[in-house]
Amino acid sequence: MSKRFRRLSHSIYECKYHLVFCPKYRYPIFEGEIKAYTEREIEKLISQKEGLEIIELNIQSDHVHLVMWIAPKYSVSQVMGYLKGKLALRRLSRYERLGKQYWGRHLWGRGYCVSTIGIDETRIREYVRWQEKKQKEIEQLQGKLFDETE
């Protein structure tokens, strides 16, 4: 099997996503130790869940870019809830000064951006067309084989 795909017990998949999320009010809080700590925590949290894998991680001063594999057993919203929830609890308890900026213990903005990564639309459409042609060729060959055996 190609390295391009991942495997679960009953499926193979290639589910890669580009996720972007920001702290509430888009404050530039990811600098110095907080940035390094956040990067370590994201890597640790992702490694704790089977079926999640970081491809790229880039933390800017006011947002996080994350490219990752997400197994089909998880929804993107589950993964984002897990990440944002755990990161908020850990960072607010470690960095008390953030609690003053983010009252109510709400560290993250409500939303996030997600886009899928994979084969472009043109290649997918070509593949689908090719599959139909190949299926017809297979059916014709099977028909010839069936006719010869009678």
Regions found by a protein language model. Give the residues of each.
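Basic nucleic-acid-binding interfaces
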Residues: 1-150
